[in-house]
């Protein structure tokens, strides 16, 4: 596969350029480089040479996928986890020894729920040297402002933190709120939440989402934001056509040595050098 640092085509107007001379090409590359620096675009793109790629799993899995449409995640160099109280007491030193290099930790839900393991998980992840941040599970029966204030109240600013995360997905099993607002309302509330988080922490949050939620609400929107996508059987380029992404949650049934039970495992979209560059630009 070939990895390319790129900015969405909209950054330079979507025009197709053609040049006949090396001089013109050199001038264009210089201009384009300057435009990329100005725009601040940090998306990653990819190319797969085959439509179905298998491969040996990097980690164990209690329900493994043996053939991935569009490309497998296992050969990616940078893997991470996301956790909540449901994983119980975690041994973060063991997680680090498994080669895990980033973590997203559940902090809050709605406007009044705090994950009881958040403080310990975020402390222990950071102590183990794993770049990490907190995520908020959005609740559609509470205003975005109230939810952002609740998150800010419970998640301190932490030097060296990854950007915080806004988890956007439908919750059909919720005992208290199964509301599904119109897509325009969803996006409006998301923007309110994200702006409040940006003002407080200095970074716009990463957007985590699922296939159905993205299709119904986010397709074609938030083009300059960082996306973390769930896709457990196919590559995101198949499941989320046209969406640039940075993180991919590829299993909810991963297994790590010396860590009890199933755990969500994710990959970063690019190479190790791209990871280093992304960290430098993203960490505050």
Model-derived features: where do they sit?
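Substrate-binding cleft of extracellular glycoside hydrolase catalytic domains
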Residues: 73, 77-89, 106-191, 198-200
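C-terminal motif of bacterial Sec signal peptides marking the signal peptidase cleavage site
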Residues: 38-40
């Amino acid at each position: 596969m070939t990895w390319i640092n790129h900015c969405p085509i909209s950054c330079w107007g979507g025009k197709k350029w053609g040049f006949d001379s090396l001089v013109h090409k050199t001038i264009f590359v210089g201009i384009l480089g300057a435009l990329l620096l100005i725009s601040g675009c940090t998306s990653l793109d990819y190319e797969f040479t085959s439509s179905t790629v298998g491969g040996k799993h990097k980690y164990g899995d209690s329900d493994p996928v043996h053939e991935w449409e569009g490309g497998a995640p296992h050969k990616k160099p940078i893997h991470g986890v996301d956790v909540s109280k449901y994983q119980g007491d975690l041994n973060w030193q063991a997680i680090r020894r498994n080669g895990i290099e980033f973590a997203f930790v559940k902090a809050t839900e709605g406007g009044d729920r705090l994950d009881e393991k958040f403080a310990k998980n975020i402390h222990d992840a950071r102590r183990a040297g794993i770049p990490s941040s907190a995520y908020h599970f959005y609740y559609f029966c509470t205003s975005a402002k109230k939810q952002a204030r609740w998150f800010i109240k419970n998640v301190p600013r932490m030097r060296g933190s990854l950007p915080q995360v806004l988890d956007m997905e439908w919750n059909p099993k919720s005992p208290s709120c199964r509301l599904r607002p119109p897509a325009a309302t969803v996006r409006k509330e998301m923007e309110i939440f994200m702006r409040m988080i940006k003002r407080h922490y200095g970074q716009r949050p990463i957007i985590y989402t699922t296939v159905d939620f993205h299709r119904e609400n986010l397709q074609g929107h938030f083009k300059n934001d960082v996306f973390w996508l769930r896709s457990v059987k196919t590559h995101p380029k198949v499941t989320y056509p046209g969406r640039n992404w940075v993180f991919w949650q590829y299993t909810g049934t991963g297994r790590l040595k010396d860590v009890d039970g199933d755990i969500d495992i994710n990959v970063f979209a690019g190479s190790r050098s791209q990871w280093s560059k992304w960290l430098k630009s993203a960490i505050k």
